[in-house]
Amino acid sequence: MGYFYDTTEKILIEQYVSEHMGEIKSKITEEAVFEAGIDLLIAEPTPERPFRSLVTCGMGAIPLELPQYLSMHRINRAELVLHLSPEWQLKSRLDWPIRLMHWLSRLPLDDASLIRDLAIFELDAFLEHDNPYRAVMLHYCNECHLLDPFVRLPRKDRVIFMELIPLLPAELDYIEAHSAEEFLRDVHRFLPLAADQTRQPVTKQLSGE
């Protein structure tokens, strides 16, 4: 049994991304499709959103075990969003953001409960010379919730979008010393946080450094 969007569902996701995140200039189509077909959409920066966004299109075909306050409204599917600095040019399918998105988006095939708010995934397998981050934290897409909280599929299920918040070592230390909830509350005014080679830990601003 496989999990796949039909053409109409793909169009609905792409329309949502184009409207709320930026024009889709390119798409990375998955080469080997087995249990699920998950493409990556690249939304270009806009004046209102000065970063490039990498968005999955296909993970939402996999039903998730989301909290009851979501599932009771038939919100039981999700797509992932990773923001990148506008200067970031994705040159290869082997670039760590692309490999990371493909890896995370397939986790629900083994465990439908892994994709959840405030879940943290360490990036040991994705550490490279151009990757200063040590983990990512999932969070319900704040800007999406303010604008339009979900995509309604023809099958009646609803798809939400979850941001990947890239965590620098100091930020991961802050979470381990406090909690993911406290970190998110303290840095909320800085969201969304994009993957940026020059970004300094937001915890520096919290501590007044």
Provide a role label for each language-model segment.
Residues 1-67, 71-75, 81-209:
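Acidic, proline/glycine-rich low-complexity IDRs
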